[in-house]
């Protein structure tokens, strides 16, 4: 009995499933389709044999790339060798991708099957996968798929920004569309303005110039000799300007109203702006082609080379095409019609717009188109795979086409391809060295500018950080000066702090008994002179700062005394009065001691 297993690749890992009742399942495909939607019925058909989760997102990306390329990864090999039966002939493995199935069958020897009932079973596994694997939720499975999808796409879409060919494809498509639109709009302006000035159509053939003249002239009756110089600037021909002026005087056109003239002028200005944008777009296309495909543009021209790239889809696809495909690229309808009717196949497609085929004789058009397609294929491959693209090879290939064209006409033998390519290699090396030298110079200049910019930023940041510190210092300094100013002013005037001066008289008036006893004891111990009483006053004052105490002591010699203190500093009469007051105090103390 053949055992049918199914391999399912998911973003979180590989899953190997086994099917029950293989013969019935293969025969009854409609019943399988019904069971896929129901989880209970699907469990009766399929069971999970093994699940190999990926250890990291990088491992998942490696396995996804291997599966897409048809390569058997080591993780997949280990899973199949471990969990599939050893008898390989009795095992049938169902896979979704035929490429990976062929690789498994070639390397491991298991018979693989795709399509049919396998596709339906894989559809059911994909639908119920989060229910088959324990611990896996639908949300986590979706997140894993999203992350792997982004990583896989990012790896596939990597490209060089400076050599992107998508801009060329869009530019040439827009350029062709603009040519059609400008032609259509110009014909509309000619018909519209031709009712008023029909002779101008015969004089001016260029569409853009005609629209500029219609915008400038307006009403033909207002055209005079003063506008002749401006007409010469627009037409760039004095004879045509004179013919326009003469035709306006004897024109057969009908009169036109102001509102119609305004509409014609506005529409003409739009056509003129479109033609100017078309010129700027053509310049942009030329510069882009010189960056992306310089050899191809030097060989066949920017417009034809861009059309070849756009028709192929990319420069890489064009480089993969053989010369026979490049020759008929753009003539697919004629080719299939010829194959269908068994007629002659076309000789050229888009390369017909090249100047070489137009210059060749009728009998040599097929030859030169085949030779030109060969050189275009070589040039596209050089542009696609060279590290430093240059136009040297394209110029040499163009010279070869010119020599071959002259050979068809005159019989002059052209140079050998080997000699031409040797010269091209020497010139290409020199050009590549020059380009690298310029790039190095530009890189050095950029680094210097970056260093200067970083130094300027660092200097500005240091200045900004030092500015607040200076502001703090300047804000602190005036505060200190304000505190010291009153003391300095009082000291200069010979006065103390008013709080100190007012506190002293109060202390003299209110003495307690203990203070009086201490003062009498000091007088009895000493000489009882006046200076000893004065020494007791500073002891009662609290001194916090030694500098302030010194400042307070020094001005006592100079300060002006109040009227209450004047008797203390007067002559011998005051000294006698003070002695009498001291004797009275002694008597009071004696009485108090006797009473106690």
From Swiss-Prot:
The chain positions of domain Nop read 292-410
Q: Which residues carry this modification: Phosphoserine?
A: 314, 465-466, 510, 518-519, 536, 562, 569-570, 581, 583
Q: What is this protein called?
A: Nucleolar protein 56
Residues the record lists as Omega-N-methylarginine modifications = 359
Single GO MF annotation: snoRNA binding
Keyword list, A-Z = Acetylation, Cytoplasm, Isopeptide bond, Methylation, Nucleus, Phosphoprotein, Ribonucleoprotein, Ribosome biogenesis, Ubl conjugation
Q: Biased composition, Low complexity: where in the chain?
A: 569-581
Q: Where, per UniProt, does this protein localize?
A: Nucleus, Nucleolus; Cytoplasm; Nucleus, Nucleoplasm
> What Pfam families does UniProt report for this protein, alphabetically?
Nop (PF01798), NOP5NT (PF08156)
- Its biological purpose: Involved in the early to middle stages of 60S ribosomal subunit biogenesis. Required for the biogenesis of box C/D snoRNAs such U3, U8 and U14 snoRNAs. Part of the small subunit (SSU) processome, first precursor of the small eukaryotic ribosomal subunit. During the assembly of the SSU processome in the nucleolus, many ribosome biogenesis factors, an RNA chaperone and ribosomal proteins associate with the nascent pre-rRNA and work in concert to generate RNA folding, modifications, rearrangements and cleavage as well as targeted degradation of pre-ribosomal RNA by the RNA exosome.
Which classification does the entry list for the species? Answer: Eukaryota, Metazoa, Chordata, Craniata, Vertebrata
Q: Which residues carry this modification: N6-acetyllysine?
A: 560
Q: How does it assemble?
A: Part of a large pre-ribosomal ribonucleoprotein (RNP) complex, that consists of at least 62 ribosomal proteins, 45 nonribosomal proteins and both pre-rRNA and mature rRNA species. Within this complex directly interacts with TCOF1 in an RNA-independent manner. Core component of box C/D small nucleolar ribonucleoprotein (snoRNP) particles; the core proteins SNU13, NOP56, NOP58 and FBL or FBLL1 assemble stepwise onto the snoRNA. Interacts with NOP1 and NOP58. Interacts with NUFIP1, RUVBL1 and RUVBL2; RUVBL1:RUVBL2 seem to bridge the association of NOP56 with NUFIP1.
Taxonomically, the superkingdom here is Eukaryota
**CC terms in the record's Gene Ontology section:** box C/D methylation guide snoRNP complex; cytoplasm; nucleolus; nucleoplasm; small-subunit processome
Organism this protein belongs to: Bos taurus (Bovine)
Q: Give one GO biological process term.
A: ribosomal small subunit biogenesis
Tell me what gene encodes this: NOP56
Q: Where is the composition biased (Basic residues)?
A: 582-596
């Amino acid at each position: 009995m053949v055992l049918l297993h199914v391999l399912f690749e998911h973003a979180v890992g590989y899953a190997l499933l086994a099917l029950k009742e293989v013969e019935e399942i293969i025969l009854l495909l409609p019943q399988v389709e019904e069971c896929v939607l129901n989880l209970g019925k699907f469990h009766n058909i399929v069971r999970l044999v093994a699940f190999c989760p990926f250890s990291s997102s990088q491992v998942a990306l490696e396995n996804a790339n291997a599966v897409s390329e048809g390569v058997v990864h080591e993780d997949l090999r280990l899973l199949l060798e471990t969990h599939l039966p050893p008898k390989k002939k009795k095992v049938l493995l169902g896979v979704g991708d035929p490429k990976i199935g062929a690789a498994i069958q070639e390397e491991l020897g298991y018979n693989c099957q795709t399509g049919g009932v396998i596709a339906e079973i894989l559809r059911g596994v994909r639908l119920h996968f989060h229910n088959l694997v324990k611990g896996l939720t639908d949300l986590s499975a979706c997140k894993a798929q999203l992350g792997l999808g982004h990583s896989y796409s990012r790896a596939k879409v990597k490209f060089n920004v400076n050599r992107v060919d998508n801009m060329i494809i869009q530019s040439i498509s827009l350029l062709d569309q603009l040519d059609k639109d400008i032609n259509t709009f110009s014909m509309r302006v000619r018909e519209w303005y031709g009712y008023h000035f029909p002779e101008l159509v015969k004089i001016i053939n260029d569409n853009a110039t005609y629209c500029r003249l219609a915008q400038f002239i307006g009403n033909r009756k207002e055209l005079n000799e003063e506008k002749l110089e401006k007409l010469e600037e627009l037409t760039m021909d004095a004879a045509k300007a004179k013919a326009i002026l003469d035709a306006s005087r004897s024109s057969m056109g009908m009169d036109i109203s102001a509102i119609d003239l305004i509409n014609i002028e506005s529409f003409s200005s739009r056509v003129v702006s479109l033609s100017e944008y078309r010129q700027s777009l053509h310049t942009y296309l030329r510069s882009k082609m010189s960056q992306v495909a310089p050899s191809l543009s030097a060989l066949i021209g920017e417009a034809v080379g861009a059309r070849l790239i756009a028709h192929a889809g990319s420069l890489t696809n064009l480089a993969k095409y053989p010369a026979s495909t490049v020759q008929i690229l753009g003539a697919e309808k004629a080719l299939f019609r010829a194959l269908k009717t068994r007629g002659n196949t076309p000789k050229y497609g888009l390369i017909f717009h090249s100047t070489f085929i137009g210059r060749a004789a009728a009998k040599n058009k097929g030859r030169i188109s085949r030779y030109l397609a060969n050189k275009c294929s070589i040039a596209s491959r050089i542009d696609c795979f060279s590290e430093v693209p240059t136009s040297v090879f394209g110029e040499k290939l163009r010279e070869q086409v010119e020599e071959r064209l002259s050979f068809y006409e005159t019989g002059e033998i052209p140079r050998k391809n080997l000699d031409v390519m040797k010269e091209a290699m020497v010139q290409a090396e020199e050009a590549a060295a020059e380009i690298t030298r310029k790039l190095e110079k530009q890189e050095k200049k950029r680094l210097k500018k970056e260093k200067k910019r970083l130094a300027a930023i660092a200097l500005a940041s240091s200045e900004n950080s030092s500015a607040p510190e200076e502001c703090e210092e300047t804000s602190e300094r005036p505060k200190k000066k304000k505190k010291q100013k009153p003391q300095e002013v009082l000291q200069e005037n010979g006065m103390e702090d008013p709080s100190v001066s007012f506190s002293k008289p109060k202390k003299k008036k209110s003495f307690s008994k203990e203070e009086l006893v201490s003062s009498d004891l000091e007088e009895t111990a000493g000489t009882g002179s006046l200076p000893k009483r004065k020494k007791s006053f500073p002891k009662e004052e609290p001194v916090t700062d030694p500098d302030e105490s010194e400042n307070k002591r020094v001005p006592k010699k100079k300060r002006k005394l109040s009227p209450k203190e004047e008797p203390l500093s007067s002559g011998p009469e005051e000294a006698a009065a003070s002695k009498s007051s001291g004797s009275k105090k002694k008597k009071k103390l004696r009485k108090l001691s006797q009473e106690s």
